[in-house]
Amino acid sequence: MQKIYNHQNVEDGIESKWREKKYFIDHNLDKKPFSILLPPPNVTGKLHLGHALDSYIPDTIIRFKKLSGYDVLWLPGMDHAGIATQSKVESELYKQNKLTRHDLGKEKFLAEVWKWKEIHEKLFRQQWQTLGLALDYSNEAFTLSKEVNEKVIKIFVELYNRGYIYKKNRAVSWDINLQTAISNIEVINKETPQKMYYIKYFFENSSEYLTIATTRVETMLSDVAVIANPKDKRYKNLKIKFLIHPITKKRLPLIFDEYVKIKFGSGLMKLSAHAEADIEIIEKLGLEVIETIDKNGYINAPDYQWHKMERFEAREKMAQFLEENNYLIKAEDSISNVSYSDRSNSVIETLMLPQWFIKMDHFRDLILKNLSSKEKIKFLPNRYKNNLKRWMNNVYDWNISRQLWWGHQIPAWYKDGKMKVQAESPGQGWVQDSDVLDTWFSSGIAAFSFFKWENDDAFFKRYYPSSLMVSGYDLIFFWISRMIFLSLEFTNQRPFKEVFMHGLIRDKDGRKMSKSLNNGIDPIEVVEKYGSDALRWFLITNTAPGMDIRYNQEKIESAWKISNKLYNVALYISSMPDNNLEAKSSKLSEQSKWILNKLSALNKQIQKVFKTYDFSIIGVEIYQFIFTDLSSWYIELIKSLNIKNEAMYVFKKILIMLHPFLPFTSDYLFNKLYNEELLEQSWPKFKRFKDSSEINLLIDAITKIRKYRDDNNISKKEKLYLCLKEKISKKNLNILLSLTNSEYKENKDFLIVLDNNSIFIEISQEQKQKQKQELEKKIAFCQSEITRAQNILSNQSFIAKAPKEKIKLEEDKLQRYKQELQIYLEELKWKY
């Protein structure tokens, strides 16, 4: 071992050793299984801090379970990430070659995407290995592999045959940038500054008008009606029932519907084809849906001057037209919720398109039934179970079709106006649906398809349902819910027994990390600077179920110091003189029994934490054990003792227990000190030793003597002369004198009270006089306070008027000062 800790030297080569020895690939079927599925990262880029957290939590759990005697399986996989990957590749193609996917054609473009996938798949594996993850690479899966594709197609066809999948022209959220429909939960609403336009809609054959407020002037060309709330007194008694459109001059019926908010704008709403709620009302009333904005976000109205104009430009030009023709009353600045694509951050357009949907009523019931059954999934923290229930009770049908090339192509076939849904082509002339499935469809079946469902029954039965799912709380609806209902439908089992929802990682100011804020942190750069153990320690010990984490550089530096401290302890123990004895629990020193009791108590806490996964609780306790119990006390207390065998025995247990939290450091030190492999060991067992009162007394005495030096500005080099009221063993007395730079000398000068003993420290005549004066001041103060309290309590007027609490306070003060006075008088008597 080098004399100075260097995390790069320590961590180098260890992960490759774990893989070579197949610690997490070879499975002992005689042991109880424990399985976890790694949330598959998208093959779109590289690892970010969220991935690191998603990885370190299950890795820590897997290592604990392995050492505790389980056959562990941590199954890795990657997600083809349809929209995200295709848009990345398209962007790169255009940046490098000025080519679009249409220039290449589907076959060549998909070949480029597969190349991208291969490159980033390798990059992810390298990064997993840098983090030191205990993954079973021999069972790695991919959501667009041949095996998974076969299962996706089978499940789609089966769901269709069961009546749970349908195709229909419906209002969908269309991403203009990505050129695909997206599901409702991929839409985010943002408060956005925009103009609210107040427009005149004149009554038919009248100079009177109604005022309609809208932020979306560009949708006016698709207006088919004006609606008001039937409870709105301003409009319910109107006799004229038609209005003339200010631009198209069409007759628009005035219709009443409770959807309209009376207090929003003028209380009137124009019905157009570019809002989901509007379309629902239009269809309910049997009116025509007239779309005037196309898939590219351009106006599609050949009869009007704004035809082929970009939608937001058209908004301004149409508002200008209305103003010039005296139809615009005013335009006010306003803040309103606007729907954006969570994928591309572009403003969503609502379009009527033929799309594939999953009916959610049946699957809602499946989830709700499971959550109240004996085989229910346990949520940690439990509040996310309630969140899921609320969401499922308000769930929309799931739009599962995407207008992409990269993904699982929908197994629907068309010919002569007919449609068939099946895995293989029905024959010549049949054309397959060009849409692909939403990425979350294949991710949703990963919970069982990755565990070799219908491919390897023995493997599936052993490891499914998985023991635990670890995920960020932001995926509960996107992914967790879909895994649950698809697993219940096709395996008749829950996908996992427990699900642990962790928080998100934010920057030091609590902001979400994003490219736009330029506040992202590359975990690999952190690992290079501080080591994987330091980053792991920071992320793990700041993880409380469901709570966000703020990135903190200082805490990572502090985490590095933990490994550094352990390294230095190992250096010291290895340098101790050999005594060639075997450590036996029956013959251990008091010091070793004391530290083992401390370790036993820590073990109980660690065992509890691995049931709740609230790792934020254990971090402080482990830190205190390493820096205080182990380094500050145990190592100090054994320096004068020839017990290397015991120190090695103790430290071996410590390293095994710390392995889940500091795998690289613990593995390296274990191998160097014991020439054995840590991952071939078992979790230590403990017997409780009788508490060593002398060791506790020793620590108490040393602590208080050091404080005495600090309080009196006495140099550590200056020798103290002291004695103890009660005798302790010669061995422990020598340790006390050595660690406090003292000599034993009978005296009764300065008293330090311990729990079960007392120390007297000799002081000079000058110090004695000064201390006597201080003591006399304390006596005088107590006497003064006693007199004051007695006078107040003997005052009948005070007793009659004062609140009981105030009287009680004075009585307590009187009692306390009497007790203190007695102590000070006794001290004055026997000291001076």
Curated annotation (Swiss-Prot):
It comes from the Bacteria. Its EC number is 6.1.1.9. InterPro entries: aa-tRNA-synth_I_CS, aa-tRNA-synth_Ia, Anticodon_Ia_Val, M/V/L/I-tRNA-synth_anticd-bd, Rossmann-like_a/b/a_fold, tRNA-bd_arm, tRNAsynth_Ia_anticodon-bd, Val-tRNA_synth_C_sf. ATP binds at residue 515. It is found in: Cytoplasm. PROSITE patterns: AA_TRNA_LIGASE_I (PS00178). It is an enzyme of class 6 (ligase). A motif ('HIGH' region) lies at residues 41-51. The keyword Amino-acid biosynthesis does not apply. GO terms for molecular function: aminoacyl-tRNA deacylase activity; ATP binding; valine-tRNA ligase activity. A motif ('KMSKS' region) lies at residues 512-516. Keywords: Aminoacyl-tRNA synthetase, ATP-binding, Coiled coil, Cytoplasm, Ligase, Nucleotide-binding, Protein biosynthesis. PANTHER family: VALINE--TRNA LIGASE, CHLOROPLASTIC_MITOCHONDRIAL 2, VALYL-TRNA SYNTHETASES. This is Valine--tRNA ligase. It comes from Mycoplasmopsis synoviae (strain 53) (Mycoplasma synoviae). The gene is valS.
